[in-house]
C-alpha cells in the first residue's frame, strides 16, 4: 500500500489520518486512535500466517508497539526463523 492516495482514502474511511513526511512514522503511514468508549477486557489472541514477504512480521510488530504505547500489556511471539520481529 505505497500509494499515498490509497492511504488517504483508507484513513478517511476508518476515521484516522494519514501522514506524508510530516509524521515520525514515515511516508504512507496510517494513524488511528483508540476509541475511548471501547473497553477491552481479558486477553485477546491474534494469529497471523500466510504467504511469505507480505508484511506479517512488520504488521505484527507495529500493532504490538502501538498497543504498548496505549498502555496495553503485549506479548508477541514470533516463530519466524528470519527473526524479523526481534527488537
Curated annotation (Swiss-Prot):
Record protein name field: Light-independent protochlorophyllide reductase iron-sulfur ATP-binding protein
> What is the stated purpose of this protein?
Component of the dark-operative protochlorophyllide reductase (DPOR) that uses Mg-ATP and reduced ferredoxin to reduce ring D of protochlorophyllide (Pchlide) to form chlorophyllide a (Chlide). This reaction is light-independent. The L component serves as a unique electron donor to the NB-component of the complex, and binds Mg-ATP.
PANTHER family linked to this entry: LIGHT-INDEPENDENT PROTOCHLOROPHYLLIDE REDUCTASE IRON-SULFUR ATP-BINDING PROTEIN (PTHR42864:SF2)
The protein's organism comes out as: Acidiphilium rubrum
Q: How is the cofactor bound?
A: Binds 1 [4Fe-4S] cluster per dimer.
Binding-site list for Mg(2+): 57
Instruction: Please report which protein family the annotation says this sequence is part of.
Output: Belongs to the NifH/BchL/ChlL family.
Sequence positions that bind ATP: 53-58
Q: Which cofactor does it need?
A: [4Fe-4S] cluster
Q: Name one GO biological process term.
A: light-independent bacteriochlorophyll biosynthetic process
Q: How does it assemble?
A: Homodimer. Protochlorophyllide reductase is composed of three subunits; BchL, BchN and BchB.
Amino acid at each position: 500500500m505505497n500509494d499515498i492516495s490509497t492511504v488517504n482514502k483508507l484513513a478517511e474511511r476508518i476515521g484516522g489520518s494519514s501522514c506524508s513526511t510530516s509524521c515520525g512514522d514515515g511516508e504512507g503511514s496510517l494513524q488511528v486512535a483508540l476509541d475511548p468508549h471501547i473497553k477491552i477486557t481479558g486477553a485477546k489472541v491474534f494469529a497471523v500466517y500466510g504467504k511469505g514477504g507480505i508484511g506479517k512480521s512488520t504488521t505484527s510488530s507495529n500493532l504490538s508497539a502501538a498497543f504498548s504505547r496505549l498502555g496495553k500489556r503485549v506479548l508477541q511471539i514470533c516463530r519466524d526463523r528470519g527473526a524479523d520481529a526481534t527488537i
